[in-house]
């Protein structure tokens, strides 16, 4: 016998994440990553995600290195635009801001920044695509170690990212995933 009680559970007082991969949605529905169709799908999924008491969202700064065999890669899905100009890295945060705003609109309270290093020992960089001399190019991935030029990249990127998180008043509810 089951008794149904007409009440709602209180709001969770813990962070709860279930990894939702934006690239998988694009692949499944055959839409371009971060096209307007994709953003609408993301909104629908975010709303359902919150209904299931999830309140922290995996945020794909760069293409996730998760669940991918060494040497293979997932569909490119990065919220950060990267350009290499005169040997320096220039970052665009517009898509990340749109993601954050959409998450908040749907009731997501916490943000888990995607993995900064590969699985299985953090030996490699995640896939990062940049505009180099006017063309899109994979500048990091399985072919690049997690040290060297990638360290220079992070030294340029992370201070700018954390400044944006403070500006958007979400630094205190943002967590960084290093590796699995």
Predicted regions and their residues:
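Aromatic-lined carbohydrate-binding surfaces of glycoside hydrolases
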Residues: 1-180
């Amino acid at each position: 016998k089951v008794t149904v009680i007409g009440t709602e559970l209180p709001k969770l007082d813990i962070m709860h994440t279930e990894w939702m991969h934006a690239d998988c949605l694009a692949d499944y529905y055959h839409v371009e990553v971060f096209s307007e169709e994709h953003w609408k799908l993301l909104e629908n999924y975010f709303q359902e995600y919150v209904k299931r008491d999830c309140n922290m969202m995996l945020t794909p700064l760069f293409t996730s290195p998760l669940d991918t065999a060494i040497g293979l890669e997932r569909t490119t899905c990065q919220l950060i635009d990267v350009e290499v100009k005169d040997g320096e890295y220039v970052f665009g945060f517009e898509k990340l801001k749109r993601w954050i705003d959409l998450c908040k609109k749907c009731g997501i309270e916490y943000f888990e920044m995607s993995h900064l290093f590969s699985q299985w020992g953090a030996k490699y960089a995640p896939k990062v695509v940049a505009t180099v001399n006017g063309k899109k190019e994979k500048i990091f991935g399985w072919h690049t170690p997690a040290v060297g030029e990638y360290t220079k990249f992070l030294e340029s990127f992370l201070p700018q990212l954390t400044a944006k998180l403070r500006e958007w008043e979400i630094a205190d509810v943002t967590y960084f995933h290093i590796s699995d």
